[in-house]
Amino acid sequence: MGQGPAGFVDIPIAARYKPETRRIACKTAPEASFSRQSRHPTQPSMTSLSEAVARRRTFAIISHPDAGKTTLTEKLLLFGGAIQMAGAVKARGEQRRAHSDWMKVERERGISVASSVMTYDYDGKTFNLLDTPGHEDFSEDTYRTLTAVDSAVMVLDAAKGIEAQTLKLFEVCRLRDMPIITFVNKLDRESRDPFELLDEVEQRLALDVTPASWPIGMGRSFLGCYDLLHDRLLLVERSRDKMGAEGETCSGIDDPKLDELLPADAVAKLREDVEMVRELCPAFDREAYLQGTMTPVYFG
């Protein structure tokens, strides 16, 4: 037997299981320096635990395939400060790939086949973002994911509205009275009328809808959105992968600043639409949203 590291006896493997060897080892080894406290780390108090829970938001992004879930995930990570440059689902050449599609099969096929979890801090809160598969072949993974989240972001293709898989996933959320935020995506392509999309969500999903933003133009004439909650003008940033400006704050929809920043016909249409929205749609009700009976609708 030789002297091992830190004063321990170096015992041959064949002899380690003999009773007399175990007694020698116990006598020779230095006294353990682990205290009860180091073996059992101090548990957080109920106050600190409740504060940590209150800071945390866990949500899933759901939709029919190819509506833009993963692209939206990249933008949320970008604006949340978790990444410096957003990736693309179907990257070409040196273009950066999406962070949530990390498996080889996902990168080859340009689809998500398993849920990915990403965490980032923003505005004093910790967000757990789950990007889920949209294809029906992998829907079991999405169904299980929806049992572990507090809320969901439902992504709609502006040209197609509510599609088959979107409806199935919504029904899973409905069973849990889960709060849902609706995001109407791809407004820079040929799209359906936004009022028609709102009506479809209201009629088919039996939800009260309240627009949180409103598009300025559609398709090739899409210029950006007006933030109805904070009275901000959000113009399209042509740089698709880096952090853009936070928008132009306005004093209201009649602010002359809008006339300076937008074409006359776009301003007139925006004011007309916003007036109609505020007449026809209910104001945002936080309790109704938390109960799963109202969905705020964002366009982008």
Question: What are the functions of these language-model segments?
Answer:
Residues 10-12, 23:
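Generic short N-terminal amphipathic or hydrophobic helices
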Residues 2-7:
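Residue-identity detector for glycine
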